[in-house]
Amino acid sequence: YFTLTSNWFVRAYNYYKDIDKFVIIIYLINQGLIYFRQNGVKIDYDTFYKDKTIEINKINISDISKDLGVPKESIRRKVLELEKEGTIKRIGKKIFVVRDTLYSSRATHTLTEIATILHEFNKILKKEKLVNEVYSVNEIIYAIKENFSYCWYQFNKFWFIYIGRWRVELKDLEYLAIGMVVIINAVKNKKFFPKNNMRLYHKALM
């Protein structure tokens, strides 16, 4: 899970050198997923990303600011930057996520990482005799892709809550990205061991 989290933030930063810009794009794309869910429409992965733009009607800066927990002026500035870069287009109150942006933000790596996590959970459930079968990572990826609009709506719903909680704590998602990289590297370091007395450890660092 921490690998998924760390990789997601690193990839988000690599897209625009600004995590909040990427979060705004994902937020806009998610409006399409919400529309499909509200209308009982199921879209698979390939159909969702094929030869299309996403049109978001009557969305304003205040809505994005409130939902993401980012000041309105910051959202306005970043949306203008995304528009100048050609990442999105605005016509009146409508915002269009252009095809190239949609295609480049495909959830390829994240999808594989989520499937890997679910596969590990599946093995635990099998070991505890709560399920009878263990599905491979590829089988899970296929199932998610076939039910993509529903599955990715649920993931984004969780992800925005997760991001929002960290934003309250740290104010800046770049700090979280750096912290995650440090944690992952520490855990993978065979010489790493937890400190028994964190208070004394922090005092020593000071």
Report each predicted region and the residues it spans.
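Short recognition helix of helix-turn-helix/winged-helix DNA-binding domains
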Residues: Y1-K42, Y142-F193
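Amphipathic, Lys/Arg-enriched alpha-helical "gate/interface" segment within cytosolic domains
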Residues: K42-D46, Y103, F192-A204
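Short, cationic-aromatic polyanion-contact patches
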Residues: D44-T47, N60, G92-T116
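A short alpha-helical element within helix-turn-helix/winged-helix DNA-binding domains
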Residues: D46-K66, L82, R199-M206
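Short amphipathic alpha-helical interaction segments
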Residues: G69-K84
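A short, conserved structural fragment
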Residues: E83-K94
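Short, amphipathic alpha-helical interaction segments positioned at domain boundaries
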Residues: Y103-I140, E146
